């Protein structure tokens, strides 16, 4: 995934499926300068946030870019 798509997903009202290492995640925010995104698991564990490289995020489904 690229940073422009991350920005679109974060600002979108739609529920867009995003995966990190095959696990469904929410994107909480991003660091454009370092090309990193802050994510947490979609299962609700908000306390398990981590920063991951944007390039390692994948979008799946009909809206994939």
Curated annotation (Swiss-Prot):
Induction info: Expressed only in the forespore compartment of sporulating cells.
UniProt-listed InterPro entries: SASP_SspH
GO cellular component: endospore-forming forespore
Keyword Coiled coil set for record: no
Pfam families, per database record: SspH
Subcellular location: Spore core
Gene Ontology process terms (BP): asexual sporulation; sporulation resulting in formation of a cellular spore
Swiss-Prot/TrEMBL keywords: Sporulation
Similarity section: Belongs to the SspH family.
Protein's name according to its UniProt entry: Small, acid-soluble spore protein H 3
Gene designation: sspH3
């Amino acid at each position: 995934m690229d940073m422009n798509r991350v920005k679109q997903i974060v600002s979108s009202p739609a529920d867009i499926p995003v995966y990190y290492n095959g696990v469904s995640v929410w994107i909480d925010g991003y660091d454009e300068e370092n090309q990193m995104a802050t994510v947490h698991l979609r299962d609700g564990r908000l306390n398990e946030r981590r920063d991951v490289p944007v390039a390692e995020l994948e979008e799946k489904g009909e809206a994939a870019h």
